Design a protein with these regions (language model features):
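Short Fe-S-cluster ligation motifs
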Residues: 50, 54-72, 104-126
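Long, compositionally biased charged/polar accessory segments in the mid-to-C-terminal portions
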Residues: 118-121, 126-144
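Long C-terminal interaction/binding lobes of large macromolecular proteins
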Residues: 148
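Extended alpha-helical surfaces
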Residues: 85, 93-107, 122
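Iron-sulfur cluster-binding cysteine motifs and their immediate structural context
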Residues: 25-51, 55, 67-97
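Ferredoxin-type iron-sulfur electron-transfer modules and their immediate structural context
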Residues: 1-29, 33, 39-40, 49, ...
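Immediate flanking context of iron-sulfur cluster ligation sites
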Residues: 11-21, 63-74
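Flexible, active-site-adjacent loop/turn segments at secondary-structure boundaries
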Residues: 2, 44, 123
Length: 148
């Protein structure tokens, strides 16, 4: 959480208009049912929470079984959203996944912390500590799936 202390009042932005209507495709497709109602995510059920934010040594079994190969976050709700279908593809080299990310496998469990740090340099994925990457990979190997 952050703060900005100002001596001037700011005019707040207008709230974003919901375009969802009666659509609940994201709710239907969430593998862990973390989206409990429109605009409400129960974080302890969310794959993204468990693979990026959680500092627990293990991923709960009920989440682990639903990982579906996700090692760093989960974009299923974004992938199925009809509004995201019209967003143009960003071909910027800075936003493309690095090759090593596409090839995470059992061998990456042997990487030392220095190798992880080198690979993650300049990436927001460095938020995921090396031991967490290993935890997430191992959880997916148990289910024979890896995806990022």
């Amino acid at each position: 959480m952050g703060f900005i202390i100002l001596t001037k009042d700011l005019i707040p932005d207008k709230p974003h208009q919901s375009l969802c209507g009666k659509c609940d495709i994201c709710i239907e497709h969430c593998p862990t049912k973390a989206i409990v109602e429109p605009f409400v995510i129960q974080s302890d059920l969310c794959i993204a929470y468990h693979t990026i934010e959680s500092r627990d040594k293990t991923i709960p079994k009920k989440i682990e079984k639903k990982l579906g190969g996700w090692v760093a976050g989960c974009d299923i709700c974004q992938d199925v959203c009809p509004w995201n279908k019209s967003v143009p593809y960003n071909n910027n080299h800075e936003t493309k996944p690095k090759e090593w990310i596409k090839n995470l496998n059992v061998e990456s469990l042997d990487w030392d912390d220095k190798t992880w740090q080198e690979n993650l340099k300049g990436s927001t994925l460095k938020r995921i500590k090396p031991w967490m990457w290993k935890r997430n990979i191992q959880a997916n190997i148990k289910n024979k799936k890896i995806k990022i």
